[in-house]
Amino acid sequence: MVSWIISRLVVLIFGTLYPAYSSYKAVKTKNVKEYVKWMMYWIVFAFFTTAETLTDIVLSWFPFYFELKIAFVIWLLSPYTKGSSVLYRKFVHPTLSNKEKEIDEYITQARDKSYETMMRVGKRGLNLAANAAVTAAAKGVLSEKLRSFSMQDLTLIRDEDALPLQRPDGRLRPSPGSLLDTIEDLGDDPALSLRSSTNPADSRTEASEDDMGDKAPKRAKPIKKAPKAEPLASKTLKTRPKKKTSGGGDSA
Protein backbone atom coordinates (compact mmCIF):
# COMPACT_ATOMS: atom_id res chain seq x y z
CA MET A 1 0.00 0.00 0.00
CA VAL A 2 2.84 2.40 0.88
CA SER A 3 4.72 1.58 -2.30
CA TRP A 4 1.54 2.25 -4.33
CA ILE A 5 1.13 5.70 -2.75
CA ILE A 6 4.80 6.57 -3.31
CA SER A 7 4.63 5.42 -6.94
CA ARG A 8 1.55 7.56 -7.58
CA LEU A 9 3.21 10.62 -6.07
CA VAL A 10 6.35 10.09 -8.17
CA VAL A 11 4.32 9.69 -11.37
CA LEU A 12 2.26 12.83 -10.67
CA ILE A 13 5.10 15.09 -9.54
CA PHE A 14 8.10 13.95 -11.57
CA GLY A 15 6.28 12.37 -14.48
CA THR A 16 3.55 15.02 -15.08
CA LEU A 17 3.96 18.34 -13.26
CA TYR A 18 7.68 18.90 -13.76
CA PRO A 19 7.62 18.02 -17.54
CA ALA A 20 4.55 20.28 -17.98
CA TYR A 21 6.39 23.25 -16.47
CA SER A 22 9.49 22.53 -18.54
CA SER A 23 7.35 22.40 -21.71
CA TYR A 24 5.90 25.80 -20.79
CA LYS A 25 9.39 27.23 -20.48
CA ALA A 26 10.37 25.76 -23.86
CA VAL A 27 7.36 27.31 -25.58
CA LYS A 28 7.96 30.64 -23.90
CA THR A 29 11.64 30.85 -24.83
CA LYS A 30 11.01 29.36 -28.29
CA ASN A 31 13.91 26.99 -27.80
CA VAL A 32 13.53 24.41 -30.55
CA LYS A 33 15.93 21.92 -28.95
CA GLU A 34 13.98 21.88 -25.65
CA TYR A 35 10.71 21.89 -27.52
CA VAL A 36 11.64 18.72 -29.46
CA LYS A 37 12.99 17.08 -26.29
CA TRP A 38 9.76 17.55 -24.34
CA MET A 39 7.57 16.62 -27.27
CA MET A 40 9.38 13.26 -27.50
CA TYR A 41 8.94 12.83 -23.74
CA TRP A 42 5.15 13.46 -23.89
CA ILE A 43 4.70 10.93 -26.71
CA VAL A 44 6.56 8.24 -24.76
CA PHE A 45 4.77 9.14 -21.52
CA ALA A 46 1.37 8.76 -23.27
CA PHE A 47 2.23 5.18 -24.20
CA PHE A 48 3.51 4.58 -20.65
CA THR A 49 0.21 5.80 -19.16
CA THR A 50 -1.78 3.52 -21.46
CA ALA A 51 0.34 0.49 -20.58
CA GLU A 52 0.26 1.40 -16.88
CA THR A 53 -3.53 1.18 -16.80
CA LEU A 54 -3.38 -2.44 -17.95
CA THR A 55 -0.35 -3.53 -15.94
CA ASP A 56 -1.83 -2.16 -12.71
CA ILE A 57 -4.69 -4.63 -13.14
CA VAL A 58 -2.64 -7.62 -14.30
CA LEU A 59 0.79 -7.24 -12.65
CA SER A 60 0.03 -5.40 -9.42
CA TRP A 61 0.64 -8.64 -7.48
CA PHE A 62 4.17 -8.94 -8.91
CA PRO A 63 6.90 -8.27 -6.29
CA PHE A 64 8.54 -4.84 -6.52
CA TYR A 65 6.12 -3.83 -9.28
CA PHE A 66 5.56 -0.30 -7.96
CA GLU A 67 9.29 0.17 -7.25
CA LEU A 68 10.09 -0.77 -10.84
CA LYS A 69 7.55 1.75 -12.07
CA ILE A 70 9.17 4.52 -10.01
CA ALA A 71 12.58 3.63 -11.43
CA PHE A 72 11.20 3.65 -14.98
CA VAL A 73 9.70 7.15 -14.62
CA ILE A 74 12.99 8.50 -13.24
CA TRP A 75 14.89 6.84 -16.10
CA LEU A 76 12.59 8.53 -18.66
CA LEU A 77 13.00 11.94 -17.08
CA SER A 78 16.69 11.94 -16.14
CA PRO A 79 18.90 14.17 -18.33
CA TYR A 80 21.76 11.68 -17.96
CA THR A 81 19.96 8.60 -19.24
CA LYS A 82 17.60 10.40 -21.66
CA GLY A 83 15.30 7.41 -21.63
CA SER A 84 12.41 9.17 -23.39
CA SER A 85 14.52 10.21 -26.39
CA VAL A 86 16.10 6.73 -26.62
CA LEU A 87 12.71 4.98 -26.65
CA TYR A 88 11.28 7.44 -29.13
CA ARG A 89 14.12 7.19 -31.67
CA LYS A 90 14.53 3.41 -31.49
CA PHE A 91 10.93 2.16 -31.11
CA VAL A 92 8.21 4.79 -31.31
CA HIS A 93 9.26 6.79 -34.36
CA PRO A 94 9.99 3.77 -36.66
CA THR A 95 6.73 2.05 -35.68
CA LEU A 96 4.60 5.15 -36.22
CA SER A 97 6.30 5.85 -39.56
CA ASN A 98 5.45 2.36 -40.84
CA LYS A 99 1.85 2.37 -39.57
CA GLU A 100 1.04 6.03 -40.17
CA LYS A 101 -1.28 5.52 -43.18
CA GLU A 102 -3.22 2.72 -41.53
CA ILE A 103 -3.58 4.73 -38.35
CA ASP A 104 -4.88 7.73 -40.33
CA GLU A 105 -7.45 5.53 -42.10
CA TYR A 106 -8.62 4.03 -38.81
CA ILE A 107 -8.96 7.50 -37.32
CA THR A 108 -11.00 8.72 -40.31
CA GLN A 109 -13.31 5.68 -40.21
CA ALA A 110 -13.76 5.99 -36.48
CA ARG A 111 -14.60 9.69 -36.86
CA ASP A 112 -17.24 8.99 -39.53
CA LYS A 113 -18.78 6.07 -37.67
CA SER A 114 -18.83 7.99 -34.43
CA TYR A 115 -20.60 10.89 -36.18
CA GLU A 116 -23.22 8.55 -37.69
CA THR A 117 -23.70 6.80 -34.37
CA MET A 118 -24.13 10.08 -32.54
CA MET A 119 -26.72 11.25 -35.11
CA ARG A 120 -28.64 7.96 -34.84
CA VAL A 121 -28.60 8.00 -31.07
CA GLY A 122 -29.61 11.66 -31.06
CA LYS A 123 -32.62 10.98 -33.31
CA ARG A 124 -33.73 8.08 -31.16
CA GLY A 125 -33.36 10.19 -28.07
CA LEU A 126 -35.44 12.99 -29.60
CA ASN A 127 -38.15 10.51 -30.65
CA LEU A 128 -38.28 9.01 -27.18
CA ALA A 129 -38.44 12.45 -25.60
CA ALA A 130 -41.25 13.52 -27.96
CA ASN A 131 -43.24 10.35 -27.23
CA ALA A 132 -42.77 10.82 -23.51
CA ALA A 133 -43.91 14.45 -23.75
CA VAL A 134 -47.02 13.51 -25.76
CA THR A 135 -47.89 10.72 -23.32
CA ALA A 136 -47.45 13.02 -20.33
CA ALA A 137 -49.62 15.69 -21.97
CA ALA A 138 -52.38 13.16 -22.75
CA LYS A 139 -52.32 11.88 -19.17
CA GLY A 140 -52.50 15.44 -17.88
CA VAL A 141 -55.51 16.27 -20.05
CA LEU A 142 -57.27 13.06 -18.98
CA SER A 143 -56.64 13.76 -15.30
CA GLU A 144 -57.97 17.31 -15.68
CA LYS A 145 -61.14 16.00 -17.33
CA LEU A 146 -61.63 13.48 -14.55
CA ARG A 147 -61.16 16.18 -11.95
CA SER A 148 -63.71 18.41 -13.71
CA PHE A 149 -66.53 15.98 -12.88
CA SER A 150 -68.64 17.38 -10.05
CA MET A 151 -69.93 15.35 -7.14
CA GLN A 152 -73.46 15.66 -8.56
CA ASP A 153 -72.40 13.91 -11.76
CA LEU A 154 -70.81 11.14 -9.74
CA THR A 155 -73.96 10.65 -7.64
CA LEU A 156 -76.09 10.57 -10.79
CA ILE A 157 -73.85 7.90 -12.27
CA ARG A 158 -74.09 5.94 -9.04
CA ASP A 159 -77.89 6.22 -9.00
CA GLU A 160 -78.12 5.10 -12.64
CA ASP A 161 -76.05 2.05 -11.82
CA ALA A 162 -78.31 1.23 -8.86
CA LEU A 163 -81.64 1.74 -10.72
CA PRO A 164 -81.91 -1.72 -12.36
CA LEU A 165 -81.55 -3.34 -8.94
CA GLN A 166 -84.64 -1.64 -7.48
CA ARG A 167 -88.33 -2.33 -7.89
CA PRO A 168 -90.90 0.42 -8.44
CA ASP A 169 -91.86 0.17 -4.75
CA GLY A 170 -88.28 0.89 -3.72
CA ARG A 171 -87.27 -2.64 -2.70
CA LEU A 172 -84.25 -4.33 -4.18
CA ARG A 173 -84.89 -6.88 -6.89
CA PRO A 174 -83.62 -10.37 -6.14
CA SER A 175 -80.93 -11.83 -8.24
CA PRO A 176 -81.86 -14.43 -10.89
CA GLY A 177 -80.46 -17.24 -8.83
CA SER A 178 -82.54 -16.39 -5.73
CA LEU A 179 -85.65 -15.95 -7.91
CA LEU A 180 -85.29 -19.48 -9.29
CA ASP A 181 -84.76 -20.83 -5.78
CA THR A 182 -87.98 -19.24 -4.52
CA ILE A 183 -89.93 -20.61 -7.52
CA GLU A 184 -88.62 -24.13 -6.86
CA ASP A 185 -89.49 -23.83 -3.16
CA LEU A 186 -93.03 -22.76 -4.00
CA GLY A 187 -93.43 -25.69 -6.40
CA ASP A 188 -92.27 -28.14 -3.74
CA ASP A 189 -94.72 -26.85 -1.06
CA PRO A 190 -97.94 -29.03 -1.14
CA ALA A 191 -100.14 -26.51 0.65
CA LEU A 192 -99.30 -23.83 -1.84
CA SER A 193 -99.94 -26.24 -4.74
CA LEU A 194 -103.45 -27.04 -3.36
CA ARG A 195 -104.20 -23.38 -2.97
CA SER A 196 -103.06 -22.72 -6.48
CA SER A 197 -105.30 -25.55 -7.80
CA THR A 198 -108.44 -24.34 -5.98
CA ASN A 199 -107.97 -20.63 -6.23
CA PRO A 200 -107.85 -20.07 -10.01
CA ALA A 201 -111.64 -20.49 -10.55
CA ASP A 202 -112.48 -18.38 -7.52
CA SER A 203 -110.01 -15.80 -8.52
CA ARG A 204 -111.40 -15.79 -12.05
CA THR A 205 -115.01 -15.36 -10.82
CA GLU A 206 -113.97 -12.68 -8.37
CA ALA A 207 -111.98 -11.00 -11.06
CA SER A 208 -114.91 -11.21 -13.50
CA GLU A 209 -117.29 -9.82 -10.89
CA ASP A 210 -114.88 -7.06 -10.10
CA ASP A 211 -114.48 -6.36 -13.77
CA MET A 212 -118.24 -6.29 -14.28
CA GLY A 213 -118.64 -4.08 -11.28
CA ASP A 214 -115.99 -1.77 -12.63
CA LYS A 215 -117.38 -1.82 -16.13
CA ALA A 216 -121.08 -1.44 -15.23
CA PRO A 217 -120.89 2.22 -14.23
CA LYS A 218 -119.07 2.94 -17.45
CA ARG A 219 -121.77 1.32 -19.64
CA ALA A 220 -124.78 2.67 -17.74
CA LYS A 221 -126.30 5.73 -19.37
CA PRO A 222 -129.16 7.94 -18.16
CA ILE A 223 -132.46 6.70 -19.61
CA LYS A 224 -134.64 9.42 -20.99
CA LYS A 225 -138.38 9.16 -20.43
CA ALA A 226 -140.28 8.69 -23.67
CA PRO A 227 -143.30 10.98 -24.12
CA LYS A 228 -146.61 9.26 -23.76
CA ALA A 229 -148.37 8.69 -27.06
CA GLU A 230 -151.99 10.03 -27.19
CA PRO A 231 -154.54 7.94 -28.96
CA LEU A 232 -155.13 8.82 -32.58
CA ALA A 233 -158.88 8.69 -32.17
CA SER A 234 -158.97 11.58 -29.74
CA LYS A 235 -156.83 13.66 -32.08
CA THR A 236 -159.21 12.99 -34.98
CA LEU A 237 -162.17 13.82 -32.86
CA LYS A 238 -160.67 17.11 -31.81
CA THR A 239 -159.76 18.11 -35.30
CA ARG A 240 -162.99 17.18 -37.05
CA PRO A 241 -166.08 19.44 -36.24
CA LYS A 242 -169.38 17.89 -35.56
CA LYS A 243 -171.94 18.00 -38.45
CA LYS A 244 -175.56 18.73 -37.89
CA THR A 245 -177.89 16.10 -39.14
CA SER A 246 -180.28 17.25 -41.85
CA GLY A 247 -182.99 14.80 -40.93
CA GLY A 248 -183.56 16.29 -37.59
CA GLY A 249 -184.13 19.74 -39.10
CA ASP A 250 -186.66 18.58 -41.54
CA SER A 251 -188.63 16.81 -38.94
CA ALA A 252 -188.66 19.89 -36.81
From Swiss-Prot:
| InterPro entries assigned | TB2_DP1_HVA22
Residues found modified as Phosphoserine: S150
Q: Where are the transmembrane segments?
A: 1-21, 35-55
* Effect seen on changing F72Y: In SPG72B; reduces REEP2 interaction with membranes; affects correct shaping of the endoplasmic reticulum
Q: Which Pfam families match?
A: TB2_DP1_HVA22
Q: Where is the composition biased (Basic and acidic residues)?
A: 203-217
User: Positions of the region Disordered?
Assistant: 165-252
Q: Name one GO cellular component term.
A: endoplasmic reticulum membrane
Which keywords has UniProt assigned to this entry?
Disease variant, Hereditary spastic paraplegia, Membrane, Neurodegeneration, Phosphoprotein, Transmembrane, Transmembrane helix
Question: What is its membrane topology?
Answer: Multi-pass membrane protein
What effect on the protein does mutating V36E have, as reported in its record? Answer: In SPG72A; abolishes REEP2 interaction with membranes; affects correct shaping of the endoplasmic reticulum
Kindly indicate whether the keyword Magnesium belongs to this entry.
no
The protein's assembly and partners: Interacts with odorant receptor proteins.
Q: Which disease is it linked to?
A: Spastic paraplegia 72A, autosomal dominant: A form of spastic paraplegia, a neurodegenerative disorder characterized by a slow, gradual, progressive weakness and spasticity of the lower limbs. Rate of progression and the severity of symptoms are quite variable. Initial symptoms may include difficulty with balance, weakness and stiffness in the legs, muscle spasms, and dragging the toes when walking. In some forms of the disorder, bladder symptoms (such as incontinence) may appear, or the weakness and stiffness may spread to other parts of the body.
Task performed by this protein: Required for endoplasmic reticulum (ER) network formation, shaping and remodeling. May enhance the cell surface expression of odorant receptors.
Output this protein's name. Receptor expression-enhancing protein 2
UniProt gene name: REEP2
